[in-house]
């Protein structure tokens, strides 16, 4: 696990984009996350694309999750969100951006189909954010560390947190389709980004805590090619922060 500590959110985005861009140039398969954490990364990748520094035209992409009951074109779907925040602004083919089928009347069938589709590909680099409690995608604390794509009932706090994106809390879906931690772990490379003091406990648990289902992010300790990129605030509770800074300085380029 490599730990990169940056000055601020903008620098986090630049560092993450620098790792991801080579995979895009090679026409790789990308794993995309939504949420606030990867926004600066997407903004930097868009800038690089507009500057002619990277192309996504031969890439495929898989989203982490989707709400049960929402179509891809619903304004609150994660597929619609990733289009607005990222894929509409680059040259990736829209048909090569995949998400779980939230509109399938049988969500368990949708989960199995999405798991099979991901298994048939090799995700070259997976972009991740992390929740304040260490959750990855919709894998909340106590989720199986080897779990596959599944139907996940949303914690009431998650429903409450996501209500800001809907007109009323009653409109927030109560279930989601999400890649499991075992699914995510098959990615060849993982880049997790986190910013802000609110993520400091989760980053400490992910990097320095025990491997435990109570901190889903800790599964990255077992991955051969995981990079954690954080700003100073998110790194504020890391006991070995100075060591990580030194190791990054000494890394052979």
From Swiss-Prot:
Q: This protein is called what? A: Glucosamine-6-phosphate deaminase
Q: EC top class, in one word?
A: hydrolase
The text of the family note is: Belongs to the glucosamine/galactosamine-6-phosphate isomerase family. NagB subfamily.
Which reactions does this protein catalyse? alpha-D-glucosamine 6-phosphate + H2O = beta-D-fructose 6-phosphate + NH4(+)
**Molecular-function annotations in GO:** glucosamine-6-phosphate deaminase activity; identical protein binding
SUPFAM superfamilies (UniProt xref) = NagB/RpiA/CoA transferase-like
Q: Name one GO cellular component term.
A: cytoplasm
Q: Which UniProt keywords apply?
A: Carbohydrate metabolism, Hydrolase
Q: Does the keyword Hydrolase apply?
A: yes
Q: Which GO terms describe its biological process?
A: carbohydrate metabolic process; glucosamine catabolic process; N-acetylglucosamine catabolic process; N-acetylneuraminate catabolic process
Gene encoding the protein: nagB
> EC annotation?
3.5.99.6
- General function of this protein: Catalyzes the reversible isomerization-deamination of glucosamine 6-phosphate (GlcN6P) to form fructose 6-phosphate (Fru6P) and ammonium ion.
Residues at the active site:
65, 133, 135, 140
Hydrolase in keyword set = yes
């Amino acid at each position: 696990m490599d730990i990169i500590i940056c000055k601020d959110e903008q620098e986090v985005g630049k560092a993450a984009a620098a790792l991801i861009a080579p995979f895009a140039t090679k026409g790789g398969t990308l794993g995309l996350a939504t949420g606030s954490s990867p926004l600066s990364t997407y903004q930097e990748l868009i800038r690089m694309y507009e500057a002619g520094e990277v192309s996504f035209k031969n890439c495929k992409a898989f989203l982490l999750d989707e709400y049960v009951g929402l179509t891809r074109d619903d304004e609150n779907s994660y597929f619609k969100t990733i289009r607005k925040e990222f894929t509409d602004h680059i040259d990736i083919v829209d048909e090569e951006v995949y998400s779980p089928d939230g509109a399938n009347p049988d969500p368990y069938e949708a989960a199995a189909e999405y798991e099979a589709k991901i298994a048939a590909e090799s995700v070259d680099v997976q972009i991740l954010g992390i929740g304040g409690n260490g959750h990855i995608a919709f894998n909340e604390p106590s989720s199986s560390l080897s779990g596959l794509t599944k139907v996940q009932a949303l914690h009431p706090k998650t429903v409450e947190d996501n209500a800001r994106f809907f007109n009323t809390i009653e409109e927030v879906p109560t279930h989601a389709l999400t890649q499991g931690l075992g699914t995510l772990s098959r990615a060849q490379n993982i880049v997790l980004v986190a910013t802000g003091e609110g993520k400091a406990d989760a980053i400490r648990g992910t990097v320095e805590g025990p491997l435990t289902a109570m901190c889903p992010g800790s599964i990255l300790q077992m991955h051969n090619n995981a990079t954690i990129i954080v700003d100073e605030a998110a790194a504020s509770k890391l006991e070995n922060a100075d060591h990580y800074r030194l190791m990054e300085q000494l890394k052979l380029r």
